[in-house]
Amino acid sequence: MNKFLKLVGYDESKKTTVRTELIAGLVTFLAMAYILTVNPNQIVGEGSPYWASVFIATALGAVIGTLLMAFLAKMPLAQASGMGLNSMLGGIIGGWGGYGAQFTPGQGFMLVLISGLAFLLLSVIKIKGKTFRELVFDGMPLSIRSSISVGIGLFIAFIGFQNAKIIVDDPYVLLKLVDFTTFDDSTKNAIVCLIGLFVISILDKFNVKSSIIIGVVVATVIGIPLGVTNLSVLAGAGDVSWKFWENFANFFTGENTVFLSFTKVFTEGIAPAGISVFTVVMILITMCMIDMFDTMGTIVGCCGGNRILSDENNKPLNYGKIMIADAIATCTGAVLGTSTVTTFVESGAGVSAGGRTGLTALSTAGMFFLSMFALPLFAAIPSAAAAAALIYVGVLMMKNNVKDIDFSNTVKSTSAFLTIAIMVLSYSITKGIGVGMISYTAMSIMSYVIQLVKYAVTKKNKPTFEVSAVSIVVSVLFCIYFFVPAVI
């Protein structure tokens, strides 16, 4: 037993016990279990014939990714399909992502695989003692990194508002708030979502670690008398079954399995006709950037400042292995048929509960494995209830990152604002990042030139060039993406 515990880094000197580690793993699972329902909804939509396959892929991706954290990194961190990236993938597959065409599920997952392989290379290749990933991360301005997270948070919250029918179409002003006086299906969905959101917010105020999943469950129950929650799925209706072996059989061999659609890429190509190679490249760069920022921000947030989980320089222990585990998980998840698997900030719930080693991650992985056998329970959760989780995660992403935007600097604040606004209004994460990067680089260079001219005249306050090579290269690539049509 002791030999096994050492495999996951368990050591009593870290001021923990087996019981504490197992409970911490359960706490982490409860904090992030919402992803099992939200992810299929985001990628293929509620009621899709692919829903069950994506659910199983989501669970398996979380199991494998979290096991990598347990045995490779030996850290109390959990992985699953990342929020924001699943919305981006859903837009790519659904045709509403602003790329001019609808990708097949297999093509979408192939993009995820390639971005994962790129992230893995960035995590391994070193230049002057630093991995290429660290150099890229350090080369991106903090205001842009933070605004990307804020923008994604607002973006997925906006999707949640639409899924719950809180925000509906309007022929005159495009969008409007649902009319609560009609008490129609849209109103009922909105009420269910708002109740769930309020429950989550109140519970989180009192530090209830499983607030999100409790709020989703409460919203689901409220939806029963309102006709929003469809309980027929619990009786075996639709494409899911309590006979778990049937769900697994469908995942590997069924007509509507994403797992098999992935293999069609080798005969159908990586992108639809009419999509340029450069567009594909920019999608891959965007995926890689988001995964990089999410992962590095999460592990520093969960482990930094904790004397047991970080070194004397406040750098998380086993930092390199954490990044490699994250990259491998992304590749594995793509092959299974789910969006980018990344380290979850909800891992902090388990750390707060006393998790200190990979045994916590092992416990979380075990819970995700068991969840695959309860597929109908998760399938019964209506989109309106799951939307409450989407909106609240958006709140958290904004709260945790907006403070890092320097609003006293007009160049940084303007470029950050454009990143956030364009991301939401264009319904495209890629375009939001592109406009933000170009505006930051252009305004920074113009400001430097003006300051340089001023220095040449006054010989006072010599300016420093603050724009990194990474920012310039990324901005040039986005300029080509925006201004040069039909490249290759």
PLM segments and residue spans:
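Helix-loop-helix hairpins and the membrane-proximal interhelical loops
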Residues: 1-54, 175-182, 216-320, 459-460, ...
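Membrane-embedded alpha-helical modules
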Residues: 101, 105-225, 229, 362-488
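Transmembrane alpha-helix interface/packing and boundary motifs in multi-pass membrane proteins
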Residues: 65-77, 201-207, 286-294, 326-336, ...
